[in-house]
């Protein structure tokens, strides 16, 4: 009407979490309606992996890197004990009563599989001890499928048809020897081994040290695969580099644990250029010197019977 002034909507200030934005055209109610996402029908249903880890486990974020978007990890830890990394600690964090309590707590979120994320804790009792751990966890979790890191290692070696393996560990000599015995019990020959002698703060080991140890352990032509032990040792980003350099599959504790757990759910772990997870990555390109050597061998052998 003549003589009347139409007023613009009162400015609305929206806090985005980064800065405050002045929105003069929308009221708060209108802004909320514009952001309505209920029609999407989310959130996306999640499938769960229950993870039991030692009290000093520090690499939760690394575990998640192998997990597809539709899967959640539900972690719990064993009770603290004032013992450094050793065979004694391995026995303490793998006691069946401790595992049972952890699995019963995790069962509240209805996981599809239980994973025990500790290498030494699952190889300290040998193959029979590892199987007993799985039985104890499944028994506490209403018959849920259960895996351990050491059991997953043997499963991965079988998947890749590996009979000779080199080992890298952050452990002391006594813990490392126990791993060697476990692998040998499964009929796998250990061709080389490097260990760091650490008893604490293993998660702080830099990638460069892991790579250096791998180069020392995996002698050219001696091993069919390399295994980097300990779920507290960072490995995700070095696996493709080491596989390209050593030209053999490189397995790590966290990798095989997630691979085996997700396999029981009928889904695949995520890991670009990792031979265990991607069959295409197992076809190593032929290097020029290898091609020449093969040609020389054929020429030398012509005419022989």
Residue ranges of each PLM-predicted region?
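Conserved beta-alpha
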Residues: 136-140, 144-199, 278
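Short terminal hydrophobic/aromatic SLiMs and anchors at protein ends
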Residues: 3-7, 19-21, 26-27
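Glycine/small-residue-rich loop that forms an oxyanion/phosphate-binding "nest" at active or ligand-binding sites
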Residues: 106-107, 112-141
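N-terminal glycine-rich anion-binding loop in soluble enzyme alpha/beta folds
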Residues: 26, 32-101, 168-206
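C-terminal functional extensions of proteins
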Residues: 252-290
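Intrinsic-disorder-associated, low-complexity terminal segments enriched in Asp/Asn/His/Tyr and depleted
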Residues: 15, 294-297
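Hydrophobic alpha-helical
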Residues: 213-245, 258
